[in-house]
Amino acid sequence: SGHGKLYANAYSVSPCGIFVPHDSDIKTPEDLANVPISVGYQSGSHYSTIQALEPFLSHNEINLSFADGLLFKRMENLIDSAVPAVNLFSGPYYFMEQLGFRKVLDTSFMMAVMVSEEADVEDIEKYFKALRMAQKDIDLRQELYTHYYRDEFPERFRDQMDTRLFGPGERIVFEPYSREFFDDSRAWIAERNIFEGGLGELTYDEAIVAPKMLESTP
């Protein structure tokens, strides 16, 4: 409560990966044992790093660093050789590929969509109708839109960027974020004690907005 509602008629999936310098001794996921990996605290990069590394390392060997800032700051730290490994997504993911950094492990992940508890449901649906149209345009001709990544980046990198090499990034999936997704995700997070003090008591029905679509979904 107080953190918004889960929009249950869509979710998104983002390409993501753990990157290291091209000359790093880290070449396999197993080489990441006890190596600090820069991630965002209680974010997609946090969860996806654990999820992707679990088949390769014990929990005691997974070393997450939360002290390296937000997405672009973490990217800068890797470029400046201030950190050994970073989990990156969106534009920074493609920029690392362009610059020749080594992707050690794919950590692509699914994201729920949160909206304000005060938001009008009709306004939310109009917003997502526009997003659906935009997603279709990107699916059809992504090369027409990758130049917009440049606007997100720190000024120091813009002249280096070749956005013709970039991919579509996060993709919105217009399918229900189901009760199964909700329950499985909560159970996974709870098992790993990621949230101190627990996850709260809200049920799926209490947490979501846009129930009309779900009622018509078998």
State what each model feature region is.
Residues 1-59, 84-88, 103-107:
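Short, glycine-/small- and polar/acidic-enriched structural segments
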Residues 2, 81, 100, 192-193:
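Short glycine-centered helix-capping/turn motifs at secondary-structure transition points
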Residues 46-68, 97-98, 146-151, 191:
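Ligand-binding cleft/hinge of the Venus flytrap
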Residues 54-69, 73, 80-83, 193-201:
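A local structural motif
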Residues 66-152:
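Pocket-lining segment of extracytoplasmic ligand-binding domains
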Residues 121-198:
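Secondary-structure end/capping motifs
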Residues 190-218:
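Conserved C-terminal helix/tail region of periplasmic/extracytoplasmic solute-binding proteins
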